[in-house]
């Protein structure tokens, strides 16, 4: 995967900016908190129905950890375009990263209820994000994200 990823500078920059987006939005801490809450709920439900408490906790933790996952990915993608623009990258090239990703990782084309949006959803969203950022730049403004986190 790394060879195609590093085909041009924007691919590596996209991944890096995306991960910075997760960090800036505190997604790791949120996932840990969600997993802990899920584990507690799983434990209580497991005890209530007579299931193995450890298995119930594991199931609850997994469900908790993946809650909001697609929202987190969308937030990180959104912020990544701002990070790229502020870093001087040509953001118009960013959406095509997901086209290449779909070719190299075909099972990413469909989200299938997973933890990440499909590559086609990402491509479309990124085009919207690029337009939003470019509109700010065209007005002579410093790009500033216009969103509120999905949960506070």
Where are these regions (language model features)?
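Envelope-exposed proteins and targeting segments
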Residues: 8-13, 72
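Post-HEXXH active-site segment of zinc metalloproteases
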Residues: 28-58, 95-98
């Amino acid at each position: 995967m790394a060879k195609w990823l590093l085909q041009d500078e924007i691919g590596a920059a996209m991944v890096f900016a995306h991960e910075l987006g997760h960090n800036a939005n505190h997604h790791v801490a949120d996932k840990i908190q969600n997993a802990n809450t899920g584990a507690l709920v799983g434990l209580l439900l497991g005890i209530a129905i007579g299931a193995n408490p450890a298995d119930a906790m594991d199931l609850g933790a997994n469900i908790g950890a993946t809650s909001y996952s697609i929202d987190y990915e969308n937030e990180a993608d959104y912020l990544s375009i701002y990070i790229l623009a502020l870093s001087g990258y040509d953001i118009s090239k960013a959406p095509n990263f997901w086209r290449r990703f779909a070719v190299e990782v075909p099972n990413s084309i469909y989200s299938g209820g997973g933890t990440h949006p499909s590559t086609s959803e990402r491509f479309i969203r990124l085009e919207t994000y690029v337009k939003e950022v470019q509109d700010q730049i065209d007005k002579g403004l410093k790009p500033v994200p216009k969103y509120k986190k999905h949960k506070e």
